[in-house]
Amino acid sequence: MNYDHILIRFGEISTKGKNRRSFIERLKQNIRLVLKDYKKVKYFSNRDRMSITLNGENPEEICSLLKNIFGIQSFSLAIKCESKLEDIKKTALAAIEGEYKPGNTFKVETKRAYKQFELDTNAMNAEIGGHILKNTDGLTVDVKHPDIPLRIEIREEATFLTIRNEKGAGGLPVGSAGKAMLMLSGGFDSPVAGFYAMKRGLSVEAVHFFSPPYTSERAKQKVMDLAGCLAKFGGSMTLHIVPFTKTQELIQKQIPENYTMTATRRLMLQIADRIREERKALAIITGESLGQVASQTLESMYAINAVTATPILRPLIGMDKTEIIEKSKEIGTYETSIQPFEDCCTIFTPPSPKTRPKKEKIEHFESFVDFEPLIAEAAAGIETITVYSEQEAHDKFAGLF
């Protein structure tokens, strides 16, 4: 079937009242960014939905990209025709003929936004259904569980016919809720946390701490690949790679062993907070889940958080590890996260980390060490790169070879 349009229905945007227009504009910008290589498409929007005119572009390719865009509740490939009965009948029959097999069932559902149309909804359903039955073989009606639900939307300017309704990613358009920094390691948790933050409308930049030679270039590439996995939900992702070797070596030398993990997390948070301020973000995102590991007890979080007044967002706080892993499989980060290249946190994990550290104690231990020069040095040596989704990166560099 030659589909010529895609109809896009909004998710939570429909509840945003006075801010509705800005949310729709943000979603439109995000869709344009993701579909920027499809030069022929045109966009139209109103209060209830958006439509894309394909103008010959590949509909299946575009649909596969739309599935990852937050703010879309659902979308459908559609055929457009004039709002005239004979045109609708002809188009409906062509749509069914392109989909059905003998033995299939179908149902016609009409939405008549154009109230001056010559037939009402029930009469239209009967008219179109009768026309299809008369001109096909082996097709019957099932109004409860049809194989082919033919939906007809009649508007004054045009009529749209759809058959398949695809589920969208839901949530809010990326960037509609502001910007935050994601502390991105190479594990399962932080990429999933980044996904959920983006789903709630946050524009996310990632911060990764890199400690060569203790961590390898492969570990660095692993994190870049994870950022690329997340980039498909926002078009691209900015990744800040922080040199952390000297800071970790000083921690190991000067801080009691069972408090090294707490000190490491506190210093990471301070550096991430400086990057956040420079990048004009308003929060920091972590992949912490309450009680999952020693650094994620409530006492640890309290002692670590004390170094900043910046909001710390923890999208996974109530999730089990198995739930997080299942989600990582769903969003496409699992296969990268299982690669056996350790990050700086796992390399320097003490044998018996303090699970209930005291804020006063870690502050006492840190008071004997001047970390500020190393924090400044790490901040000055940050490598900032833009990471694209796997497909976009392939397209971007394909012409070079």
Curated annotation (Swiss-Prot):
CDD domains tied to this protein: PPase_ThiI (cd01712), THUMP_ThiI (cd11716)
Example GO BP: thiamine biosynthetic process
InterPro entries: Rossmann-like_a/b/a_fold, ThiI_AANH, ThiI_fer, ThiI_N, THUMP_dom, THUMP_ThiI, tRNA_STrfase, tRNA_sulfurtransferase_ThiI
Reactions listed under catalytic activity: [ThiI sulfur-carrier protein]-S-sulfanyl-L-cysteine + a uridine in tRNA + 2 reduced [2Fe-2S]-[ferredoxin] + ATP + H(+) = [ThiI sulfur-carrier protein]-L-cysteine + a 4-thiouridine in tRNA + 2 oxidized [2Fe-2S]-[ferredoxin] + AMP + diphosphate; [ThiS sulfur-carrier protein]-C-terminal Gly-Gly-AMP + S-sulfanyl-L-cysteinyl-[cysteine desulfurase] + AH2 = [ThiS sulfur-carrier protein]-C-terminal-Gly-aminoethanethioate + L-cysteinyl-[cysteine desulfurase] + A + AMP + 2 H(+)
Pathway assigned in UniProt: Cofactor biosynthesis; thiamine diphosphate biosynthesis
A GO MF term: CCA tRNA nucleotidyltransferase activity
Pfam families membership: ThiI, ThiI_fer, THUMP
Amino-acid positions noted as binding ATP in the UniProt annotation, renumbered to this chain: 183-184, 208-209, 265, 287, 296
Locations listed in the record: Cytoplasm
Record's keyword terms, sorted: ATP-binding, Cytoplasm, Nucleotide-binding, RNA-binding, Thiamine biosynthesis, Transferase, tRNA-binding
Residues annotated as domain THUMP: 60-165
EC number: 2.8.1.4
Organism superkingdom: Bacteria
One GO cellular component, as annotated: cytosol
Enzyme class: transferase
Entry function: Catalyzes the ATP-dependent transfer of a sulfur to tRNA to produce 4-thiouridine in position 8 of tRNAs, which functions as a near-UV photosensor. Also catalyzes the transfer of sulfur to the sulfur carrier protein ThiS, forming ThiS-thiocarboxylate. This is a step in the synthesis of thiazole, in the thiamine biosynthesis pathway. The sulfur is donated as persulfide by IscS.
Family that this chain belongs to: Belongs to the ThiI family.
Protein name per UniProt: Probable tRNA sulfurtransferase
Organism: Bacillus velezensis (strain DSM 23117 / BGSC 10A6 / LMG 26770 / FZB42) (Bacillus amyloliquefaciens subsp. plantarum)
